[in-house]
Regions:
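Cytochrome P450 heme-thiolate "Cys pocket" and heme-binding signature region
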Residues: 396-431, 454-457
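Conserved cytochrome P450 K-helix/beta-meander segment immediately N-terminal to the heme-binding cysteine loop
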Residues: 370-401
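C-terminal helix/juxtamembrane-tail motif
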Residues: 61, 444, 458-475
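Cytochrome P450 heme-thiolate monooxygenase catalytic core
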Residues: 101-113, 147-305
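N-terminal membrane-proximal hinge/A-helix region immediately C-terminal to the signal-anchor transmembrane segment
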Residues: 2-115, 130-131, 154-159, 410
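Cytochrome P450 heme-binding "Cys pocket" and the immediately downstream C-terminal segment
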Residues: 424-461
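Cytochrome P450 catalytic-core helices
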Residues: 300-319, 323, 425-440
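Conserved cytochrome P450 K-helix E-x-x-R motif and the immediately C-terminal K′/meander segment
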Residues: 44-67, 254, 258-262, 324-360, ...
Length: 475
């Protein structure tokens, strides 16, 4: 345990723009605070070799030790961590303000500052963010969005499944499922962008797409390697860890722009690109939003899909449940997988004004970290929290009555409030369709399941490639 706590100390470092002081006005106690290591000690620990891959475990142990709200200092930055379900809900519903601020990784901010690369919604703040987010809300989150999104998703996944069928007539082992699902997620987003027309075809386009998805994967991996290191120093001395990160971002943006140019050559499209044009969004802003939209899609949806197949392989009775109950059961499977393995194990906000969090007064500008991984596995909120039990989400399932605790908003994989995930309907449609088509068409199992553990690499991902044995059913 001490080793994990030491490791976590190296993992988090936040940009100076988020630095603040936190004061409390509680009559009896102050906010529990983790003991700070001397600055030199932190850097020595960092050099010894922690890359933040067990950050979710470190913070979970902190909560076990200090409670559901505690403060920790990383460098010169005070951060407030919360795992109380009601406090998390209040943060998103009542405290985040009209223009919610959130924490971005230091390397991403430095890259944008150094190279002047204006980015999409994730990087926007204030009125600029709100104006563009309102447009995206209208197009992607209204009730009628499900229809046109579902058509694009189903078309793409059907093609993907046919490819797997062709490969696995006599059984195969897919050694790197993550890369295939990354590629699929990117294709889904592109189909959503163009609508009812076909995407570009040919070897050149396929190679471009593969290179792009691989470069995006590398962004997240190289970002994690920069955790806890003074990024300005890495840049100033041109250290390899910075070079690797910069090369990945350079390549991803270059290839993303090339992909966008290929997509824009398509005539008579009916998808998101046309809809954004109909909203009079200017071309530069549209390009920024679309490229970041494509980049974000791969990591989040791909790894959620991967965790679902892993969990189904380890709980084969749930495959039978899906085949029996079909589409009605799949949303419960998705919710339960995201409770156990939220792709974003931490959600962040910057307080826009002095606020009361729990019983404590917290100053404007304070970074607050919602520990979603911890809240989702808390027995106070979910009975048998370590077990994969999709039926816990089904109000009509008699087995649910045996589970005493069930607080749905303790698991918020898409967050809440104004800055919640704008692509959640696309993600849910993709996950539901992919699960159904895979379960319906294949017998599958994860052949290295017992050795799989979650690690933090920006997202919560498996610690090694998941190897999936796949065979067409009744073949």
């Amino acid at each position: 345990m001490n080793q994990i706590l030491k490791l976590g100390k190296k993992c988090l470092r936040f940009p100076k723009k988020y630095e603040t002081n936190i004061t409390t006005k509680k009559k009896t106690n102050t906010i529990p605070r983790a003991k700070s290591l001397p600055l030199i000690g932190t850097k020595i620990d960092l050099i010894k070799g922690g890359l933040g891959t067990r950050l979710h475990e470190f913070i979970d142990l902190r909560h076990q030790d200090l409670g559901n709200i505690f403060m920790e200092n990383f460098g010169t930055t005070d951060l407030l961590f919360i795992s109380d379900a009601e406090l998390i809900r209040k943060l998103f519903i009542n405290l985040e303000g009209k223009y919610p601020g959130h924490i971005l990784p230091d390397p991403w901010l430095l890259y944008e500052k150094l190279y002047g690369q204006k980015r999409g919604l994730l990087f926007m703040d204030g009125e600029e963010w709100w104006q563009n987010r309102r447009i995206m809300n209208k197009l992607l989150l209204k009730d009628n969005a499900n229809c046109w999104i579902k058509d694009s998703v189903t078309k793409t996944i059907t093609i993907f499944i046919e490819h797997w069928k062709e490969q696995s007539k006599h059984g195969i082992v897919i050694n790197d499922v993550a890369s295939e699902l990354y590629n699929l997620s990117t294709k889904v987003i592109i189909q959503v962008l163009i609508g009812n027309t076909d995407p570009p075809q040919g070897k050149h386009y396929d190679e471009l797409l593969n290179m792009f998805t691989e470069s995006v994967k590398q962004i997240f991996e190289t970002t994690t390697k920069l955790y806890g290191i003074p990024v300005n120093w890495c840049h100033r001395f041109n250290l390899k860890v910075w070079q690797d990160f910069k090369e990945c971002v350079d390549l991803s943006l270059l290839l993303g722009n090339k992909l966008l140019k290929e997509i824009l050559t398509i005539k008579n499209s009916s998808g998101l690109i046309k809809k954004l044009g109909d909203e009079k969004m200017d071309e530069i802003t549209m390009s920024r939003i679309i490229i970041d939209f494509i980049i974000a899609a791969g990591d989040t949806t791909a790894y959620t899909s991967l965790w679902i197949f892993y969990l189904l392989s380890q709980n084969r009775n749930e495959i039978t449940e899906i085949r029996s109950k079909q589409h009605t059961y799949i949303p419960f499977v998705i919710k339960e997988a995201m409770r156990l393995y939220p792709v974003a194990p931490f959600l962040t906000r910057i307080l826009p004004q002095d606020s009361v969090v729990g019983e404590y007064s917290v100053k404007k500008g304070t970074p607050i970290i919602a520990s979603i991984y911890t809240s989702g596995r808390n027995e106070q909120y979910f009975s048998k929290p370590e077990e994969f039990l999709p039926y816990r989400w089904d109000r009509l399932d008699e087995r649910k009555g045996k589970l005493k605790n069930h607080i749905p908003f303790a698991s918020l994989p898409f967050a809440l409030g104004a800055r919640s995930c704008v692509g959640r309907k696309i993600a849910m449609a993709q996950l539901a369709e992919l699960i159904w088509q895979v379960v319906e068409n294949f017998d599958f199992r994860c052949i290295n399941g017992p050795s799989i553990k979650p690690i933090t690499s920006q997202a919560l991902i498996p610690n090694k490639n998941i190897e999936l044995s796949l065979k067409v059913r009744n073949a």
